[in-house]
Amino acid sequence: MADKYNVFDQLGELENTLNTTLTQISGIRQVLESSMTENATLRMELEKLRDRLAEFEKKEVKKETPKDQPNPNLIQIFNEGFHVCHLHYAERLAEGESCLDCLELLYR
């Protein structure tokens, strides 16, 4: 008979242990759900930030590439009558002369 009471005691202890374990598992599940939700939110935010960064980089590249306009300093020197080409740099142009090398350098 003592064995039967011992079995009931052990069964009661097992039930208490299982309830404690179930409570711990429930807490872990809540933490995991919260972490997964936060992770998904952060991933979406990261994707948006990457898209914005790509837009800014495209705009930055566009700002750096306006090579349509020649260097204003070189234009001023050329208009004052001096060569700006590598071959004859700073030599005076003859009256009415235009140098193809200078023009190519200015307007490429």
Swiss-Prot record:
NCBIfam families: PRK13169.1-3. This is Replication initiation control protein YabA. One of its GO terms (biological process) is DNA replication. It is found in: Cytoplasm, Nucleoid. InterPro entries: YabA. Homotetramer. Interacts with both DnaA and DnaN, acting as a bridge between these two proteins. GO terms for cellular component: nucleoid. Binds 1 zinc ion per subunit. The keyword Transmembrane does not apply. Its cofactor is Zn(2+).
